[in-house]
Amino acid sequence: MDRVVLMLSVLSLGVSSQPITDGQRLFSIAVSRVQHLHLLAQRLFSDFESSLQTEEQRQLNKIFLQDFCNSDYIISPIDKHETQRSSVLKLLSISYRLVESWEFPSRSLAGGSAPRNQISPKLSELKTGIHLLIRANEDGAELFPDSSALQLAPYGDYYHSPGTDESLRRTYELLACFKKDMHKVETYLTVAKCRLSPEANCTL
């Protein structure tokens, strides 16, 4: 009798934990994908910087520090403490918007090398994965209640051929912002994934 009770308890535990296991699996895939994109962004940015003269690097970095990425208009946690206080759904929604904001600009990153041509399809896969996670966690909440007010312009003016200096600035800004945003998404998804493990330490 005791053995039967034990077996039923184990089966019951397995059934009750299944949704969490599925959620963790989806999160693991999403985190793995954004980690790959973040590493790719770091490599592309580093390669571009290496191709510049020292003075060009200094000037471009100075300009970038005074400028903003288009995605800065997406409201997101201002520091690690606010990130840790944010709900899973909020972190997922912000991540979705950040990834979505790169659907058009990522086309300008393509070409020249195989890694660059991987960016757009991998962003699309990541966006789909995050959307699945949102649907699994929204629990009746309205999806992106203020998204209609969010209209991000493309990075730079891609309808005119820029001069050499402008082209360098534009490429630098594009790669730097892409790296910055993929780092944000990686952080948000990692924290959200950690929330599925009640005993885990999600400190950044």
UniProtKB/Swiss-Prot annotation:
Top-rank taxon of the source lineage equals Eukaryota
Gene Ontology biological process terms from the UniProt entry: animal organ development; growth hormone receptor signaling pathway; positive regulation of growth; positive regulation of receptor signaling pathway via JAK-STAT; response to nutrient levels
Q: Which InterPro entries match?
A: 4_helix_cytokine-like_core, Somatotropin, Somatotropin/Prolactin, Somatotropin_CS
Cellular compartment(s): Secreted
Positions bound to Zn(2+)? H36, E186
Annotated SUPFAM superfamilies? 4-helical cytokines
Q: Which residues carry this modification: Pyrrolidone carboxylic acid?
A: Q18
Q: Which keywords belong to this entry? A: Disulfide bond, Hormone, Metal-binding, Pyrrolidone carboxylic acid, Secreted, Signal, Zinc
First-listed, main subcellular location of the protein, grouped into a coarse class: secreted
Give disulfide pairs as residue numbers: C69-C177, C194-C202
| Regions annotated as coiled coil | none
Pfam families assigned to the protein according to its UniProt record, in alphabetical order = Hormone_1
Renumbered to this chain, the signal peptide range is 1-17
A GO molecular function annotation here is:
metal ion binding
Annotated Gene Ontology cellular component terms: extracellular space
What the protein does comes down to: Growth hormone plays an important role in growth control and is involved in the regulation of several anabolic processes. Implicated as an osmoregulatory substance important for seawater adaptation.
Q: Which family does it belong to?
A: Belongs to the somatotropin/prolactin family.
The record's section on PANTHER family has:
SOMATOTROPIN, SOMATOTROPIN,PROLACTIN
Any idea what this protein is called? Answer: Somatotropin
What's the source species for this entry?
Acanthopagrus butcheri
